[in-house]
A protein has these predicted regions:
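Glycine-rich, acidic loop regions that bind phosphate or pyrophosphate groups
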Residues: 1-36
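Conserved thiamine diphosphate
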Residues: 5-6, 12-16, 124-214
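Short gly/pro/ser/thr-enriched loop/turn and capping motifs at secondary-structure boundaries
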Residues: 5-7, 86-87, 109-111, 139-140, ...
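Short acidic, glycine/serine/threonine-rich loops at helix termini
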Residues: 9-12, 89-94, 114-116, 143-146, ...
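Active-site diphosphate/adenylate-binding microenvironment
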Residues: 38-116, 121-122, 127
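Glycine/aspartate-rich loop-and-adjacent alpha/beta segment that forms the canonical ThDP
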Residues: 208, 214-262
Length: 262
């Protein structure tokens, strides 16, 4: 099928009213609907921007996305790993130019996707800077591929949202069962040290103030780099999670599982 002809036919059909005649202002007044939609959009953007401006410690993932957005150039490419990283990238980063600049494995549920995907993107588009957004759990699946980044001197910056847990599972269990389990929480892995062992330039960031400079330095590095960002464990981009516990995460028991630092 010809996509152009199909789109033209679809546009013609959408321009017609329910009786097949061209839609006219006297047939339907959409102004109230448009006004309501504009109001909801404005309110959502205000909430999003407030969260993105957070100075909280540990660092809010929303702030990380704001800093990434500020650091990206129009031709840069962001690759989000599975689970919460895809949600953070999809909700809190505003794409300001056309084209497929943000990639994620939605529907595939494949943790460890982002670093191997970045290798492919960097090989296919050698002039582009590539940024990986990964949780600490997901990076554990593909940490060995940092050796490939170094061997090929690929311009890939890995940003780790280090919440020291399986974040999605932690939320699911707390919402559905009212408690945490020990296997949800990790020890505090020093990903910057791990990355240096593979030959990457690396920094660990624990407060939001230095985050922008750390990202800029990583993106300007002559080879691959990693920024390990220590983030708040009880943050989520998933609306259903927030609704389950109340907006603002009120009522969530933030106590880590027994014997673990969370």
């Amino acid at each position: 099928a010809d996509a152009r002809q199909g789109l033209r036919a679809l546009a013609a059909a959408l321009a017609a009213g329910p009786d097949g005649q061209p839609d006219r202002p006297d047939q339907a007044d959409r102004a109230p609907w448009r006004a309501r939609l504009a109001g909801l959009t404005a309110a959502w953007r205000a909430d999003r921007d407030r969260e993105r401006a957070s100075d909280a410690v540990p660092i809010a993932p929303q702030r990380v996305l704001a800093e990434i957005e500020a650091a990206l150039r129009p031709d840069d490419i962001l690759i989000c790993d599975a689970s919460l990283a895809s949600g953070w990238g999809g909700v809190y980063l505003e794409q300001r130019s056309s084209g497929r600049r943000v990639l994620s494995p939605r529907g595939q549920a494949g943790l460890g996707y982002a670093v191997p995907a970045a290798i492919g993107v960097a090989a296919a588009r050698p002039a582009a800077r590539v940024v990986v957004l990964s949780g600490d759990g997901a990076l554990g699946y593909a940490a060995g591929e940092m050796a490939t980044l170094t061997e090929q001197a690929l311009p890939v910056t890995v940003v780790v949202l280090n919440n020291r847990s399986w974040g999605w599972i932690r939320w699911y269990r707390r919402i559905n069962f009212g408690r945490a389990w020990e296997e949800e929480d990790f020890g505090d892995v020093a990903f910057a040290d791990v990355a240096r062992g593979f030959g990457l330039a690396a920094q660990r960031v624990t407060e939001p103030g230095p985050l922008g400079a750390a990202l800029a330095a990583a993106l300007d590095a002559p080879g691959p780099a990693l920024v390990d960002v220590v983030t708040e464990a009880w943050q989520t981009p998933i609306t259903a999670h927030r609704r389950a516990v109340g907006d603002g995460m009120d009522g969530v028991d933030r106590t880590p599982a027994p014997g673990y630092g969370g």
